[in-house]
A protein has these predicted regions:
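Exposed beta-sheet edge and beta->alpha loop/turn motif
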Residues: 103-168
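Short, low-complexity N-terminal intrinsically disordered segments enriched in polar/charged residues
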Residues: 2-59, 71, 107
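Soluble, non-transmembrane catalytic domains of enzymes that act on hydrophobic metabolites at membranes
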Residues: 44-51, 90, 159-164
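Residue-level detector of secondary-structure transition/capping positions
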Residues: 41, 60, 80, 120-122
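Short solvent-exposed beta->alpha transition segments
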Residues: 53-113
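Short, flexible helix-adjacent loops and helix caps
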Residues: 45, 61-65, 126
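Short, solvent-exposed loop/turn segments at secondary-structure boundaries
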Residues: 24, 64-67, 129
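Residues that act as N-cap/strand-start positions at coil-to-secondary-structure junctions
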Residues: 36, 96-98, 139
C-alpha cells in the first residue's frame, strides 16, 4: 500500500501535467513556435549546441548540408568549441529579424511552415569591445515543424544566404 507522501507526490505530478497540458492548449500554435525559435536563438547565443538540438525532432533533416539532428548538433558543438574565447564566452550572435512567417497547415494542424530571417554577427574582443558587433551575414531559414509529444519541433530546414556569408 502506498504511503501518504507517495500518493501526494503522484497527485502533485499529475496535477502539474494536467495544468501544463491545459495551459499550452490555450496558447496559439504560432506563439508556441515563436517561443521555440526564440529559445533556439538564445541557446545558440549562449553557445549551447544541445539546447539548439532540443528544438529538433528525432527525425530532423537539414537539407542544405544533408545533416540529421545528431550531425547538426555535433557540427554546432565543433563550431562553438572553435569560436569560444579564452574567457569562455561565445562571440557569435544570432538575432532574429522582426519579419518571420509561421503558417500552420489547415489540412493538418499539427504541421507548420516557418520562415525566419536571422542576422549573424561576431562580438568584438579586446580594445574594440565597445564597437558594434561585426556583421557576418543575413540568412533566411525555411523549416517545417511538427507538433509531437506536447510540443513543436523542427523536422526539416534549409537556408539561403541573403547578405554577407555563412557565419560558419
Amino acid at each position: 500500500m502506498l504511503k501518504k507522501p507517495t500518493v501526494l507526490l503522484i497527485l502533485v505530478l499529475a496535477g502539474t501535467w494536467l495544468a501544463y497540458t491545459f495551459i499550452t492548449g490555450l496558447i496559439p500554435d504560432e506563439t508556441q513556435i515563436t517561443w521555440l525559435v526564440e529559445g533556439m536563438q538564445e541557446d545558440f547565443n549562449n553557445g549551447a549546441a544541445t539546447g539548439v538540438g532540443k528544438g529538433l525532432s528525432a527525425d530532423f533533416e537539414e537539407e542544405a548540408y544533408g545533416l540529421d539532428k545528431r550531425g547538426l548538433v555535433l557540427g554546432l558543438m565543433h563550431v562553438m568549441r572553435q569560436e569560444r574565447a579564452s574567457d569562455g564566452t561565445f562571440p557569435l550572435r544570432a538575432e532574429i529579424r522582426d519579419t518571420h512567417q509561421i503558417t500552420v497547415h489547415q489540412t493538418d494542424p499539427r504541421t507548420a511552415d516557418v520562415t525566419v530571417l536571422v542576422e549573424f554577427t561576431r562580438l568584438r574582443r579586446g580594445a574594440s569591445q565597445d564597437a558594434p558587433p561585426k556583421a557576418l551575414g543575413l540568412l533566411q531559414f525555411d523549416g517545417k515543424c511538427r507538433y509531437e509529444n506536447g510540443s513543436w519541433r523542427f523536422v526539416s530546414s534549409t537556408h539561403e544566404v541573403l547578405e554577407g556569408r555563412r557565419p560558419f
